[in-house]
């Protein structure tokens, strides 16, 4: 796509065929300006991958021939609706959070296998992710598959060390904390020692995240799509993944890290809900320095009373859900609750103590 002659042309968009269609997975693509989000999306839009992918750009920037061709119609007027590309993909530019664009896309959803939603460089991907849980009408048509954060290998550490006013979270650290996958891009521009430091810093913030390293945003699409980060299809895989997560040691952003612990037994769902709500909504719990703990991402596999299947806990900011997985607790398998918290000012010792105290009332732990 380097040659402007190769830019896609506008073609009419046909309405979706009649008949039932499956839910469409949505992946949120986030990252700082210049990290390589647009390059990644351009690659996906133009690569032959036999998938019908709709890409929703938050806004078109200045620069590449592809962007210019997308933003201008055949009549030379600004084009902010839909553009279908030769490989079957679709592109859209919107000026809002993408909600209207997705609703419009649903009218044509029979044409697509996947939706990629770009956020602006400083946007909080958690706020965008939340709309998929809150909007029941959207929820029937789409589901959130994962959050992908693109990081500039050369300037990533600089963004992470940027000082913020008291009480504000570093945006780059937040984007990593929320990510299911991070793509460290432009690795050819840094030495291995710098790359190692960035890799360690990413891992210290989010011990759950998968890390890919690349140049020019070239990645295997199978690594980016179908992450199933928010569903319960594979409870066994999540259980094994959580077993490998360790409490991290803070690096650059000393207030942002991953905490994990496990507590044996089965707990009351009602008391568990109270604990989670006090943590996420009320921000009741404070660390040893007296600072309120802020959880940005929460995951867990839990054993609830009167339930024979393992229950998955997912949380983003103030929103959370508990959902049964297909996996049963085996007869001889010890029942336990394993939780992973990613956020700011977290103290694992205090969190575990508060969890046990909250769910231990009224003989709730069996």
From Swiss-Prot:
Record keywords, A-Z: Chaperone, GTP-binding, Hydrolase, Metal-binding, Nucleotide-binding, Nucleus, Zinc
Describe the location of the CobW C-terminal domain by residue ranges: 258-357
Any idea which positions bind Zn(2+)? 89, 91-92
- SMART domains recorded: CobW_C (SM00833)
Catalyzed chemical reaction(s): GTP + H2O = GDP + phosphate + H(+)
| Family as reported in the entry's similarity comment | Belongs to the SIMIBI class G3E GTPase family. ZNG1 subfamily.
Q: What does this protein do?
A: Zinc chaperone that directly transfers zinc cofactor to target metalloproteins, thereby activating them. Catalyzes zinc insertion into the active site of methionine aminopeptidase METAP1, which function to cleave the initiator methionine from polypeptides during or after protein translation. Mechanistically, the N-terminal psi-PxLVp motif binds to the C6H2-type zinc finger of inactive form of METAP1.
What is this protein's record name?
Answer: Zinc-regulated GTPase metalloprotein activator 1
Give the encoding gene's name.
Answer: zng1
């Amino acid at each position: 796509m380097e040659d402007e002659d190769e830019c896609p042309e506008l073609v009419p968009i046909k309405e979706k065929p009649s008949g039932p269609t499956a839910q469409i997975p949505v992946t949120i693509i986030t990252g700082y300006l210049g990290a390589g989000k647009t390059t990644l999306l351009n690659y996906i839009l133009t690569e032959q991958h036999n998938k019908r992918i709709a890409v929703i750009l938050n806004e078109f920037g200045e620069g590449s021939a592809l962007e210019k061709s997308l933003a201008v119609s055949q009549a030379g007027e600004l084009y902010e609706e839909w553009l279908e590309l030769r490989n079957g993909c679709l592109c859209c530019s919107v000026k809002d959070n993408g909600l209207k664009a997705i609703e419009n896309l649903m009218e044509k959803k029979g044409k697509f296998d996947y939706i990629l939603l770009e956020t602006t460089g400083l946007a909080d991907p958690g706020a965008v992710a939340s709309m998929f849980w809150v909007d029941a009408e959207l929820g029937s048509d789409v589901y959130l598959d994962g959050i992908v954060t693109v990081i500039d290998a050369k300037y990533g550490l600089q963004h992470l060390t940027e000082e913020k006013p008291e009480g504000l979270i570093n945006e780059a650290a937040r984007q990593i904390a929320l990510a299911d996958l991070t793509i460290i891009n432009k690795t050819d521009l840094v030495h291995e020692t710098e790359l190692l430091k960035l890799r360690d810093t990413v891992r210290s913030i989010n011990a759950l995240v998968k890390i890919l390293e690349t140049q020019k945003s070239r990645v295997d699409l199978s690594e980016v799509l179908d992450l199933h980060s928010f569903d319960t299809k594979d409870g066994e895989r999540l259980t094994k993944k959580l077993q490998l997560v360790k409490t991290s040691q803070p690096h650059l952003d000393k207030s942002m890290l991953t905490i994990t612990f496990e507590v044996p037994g089965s707990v009351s769902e009602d008391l568990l809900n109270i604990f989670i709500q006090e943590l996420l909504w009320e921000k009741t719990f404070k660390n040893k320095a007296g600072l309120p703990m802020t959880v940005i991402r929460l995951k867990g596999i839990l054993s609830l009373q009167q339930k024979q299947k393992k229950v998955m806990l997912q949380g983003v900011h103030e929103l959370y859900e508990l959902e049964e997985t297909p996996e049963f607790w085996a007869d001889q398998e010890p029942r336990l609750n394993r939780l992973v918290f990613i956020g700011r000012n977290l103290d694992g010792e205090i969190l575990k103590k508060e969890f046990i105290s909250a769910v231990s009332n009224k003989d709730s732990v069996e």
